[in-house]
From Swiss-Prot:
It comes from Treponema pallidum (strain Nichols). PANTHER family: DEHYDRODOLICHYL DIPHOSPHATE SYNTHASE 2 (PTHR10291:SF0), DEHYDRODOLICHYL DIPHOSPHATE SYNTHASE FAMILY MEMBER (PTHR10291). PROSITE patterns: UPP_SYNTHASE. Mg(2+) binds at residues 9, 194. Its EC number is 2.5.1.-. This is Isoprenyl transferase. Keywords: Magnesium, Metal-binding, Transferase. GO terms for molecular function: ditrans,polycis-polyprenyl diphosphate synthase [(2E,6E)-farnesyl diphosphate specific] activity; magnesium ion binding.
Amino acid sequence: MQHVAIIMDGNGRWAERRGLRRSAGHRRGLQTAREIVAALCAIRVPFVTLYVFSTENWKRSAHEVHFLMNLIRWYLKKEMSFYVEHAIRVVHLGCAQTLPPDVRSQIEYVVERTRSHRGTTVALAINYGGKDEILRAVKKVLCSTSCPDGELLTEEAFGACLDAPQLPSVDFLIRTGGQQRMSNFLLWQSAYAEFYFTDILWPDFRVEDMLRALDEYRLRTRTFGGLE
């Protein structure tokens, strides 16, 4: 297994069920993210992608969006020592240009600071949407002089125009929170991904739950459209 992607769903509902503000769920969700990433690093999963903030999340209340942007900036700064300790290389997925300047600067700092790390690569999908990524990749292709004839375009050439072309295809996509949909996440990269859905809300998702999911993945047979 090369690449595990996670849709970390259920932070707000976790808080609301406890009579707390949604912000409390988002804070607790960050702690869960650290625990899960540390565990995946320990078992040497080479690539992990976390769905942090989608292009659709801008539709939430201005108050919640403002809180999330501040939380993301704070989290990236706080986790720098964690990334160094585990030799994690951080890459960003999503449109950085439309993020608040302070958030964008913090992302750029963490990406540059961890560029030489040789441990697990953690891709943070912030202001990310699968359709948006594909559209931006198409625009790159159209502006490229290396492929003037669309008929010559290959999957490999197109993949090189995605946000993080070094990421391999997703092997296993985990979604917490009870919903069973992709929510515009890694549409190109998940063509042959195995999916795992759980009702557990993200803040309650423990390392044991993740290991149980990985055990189920190992029992599956992937044929990639062929025969067993």
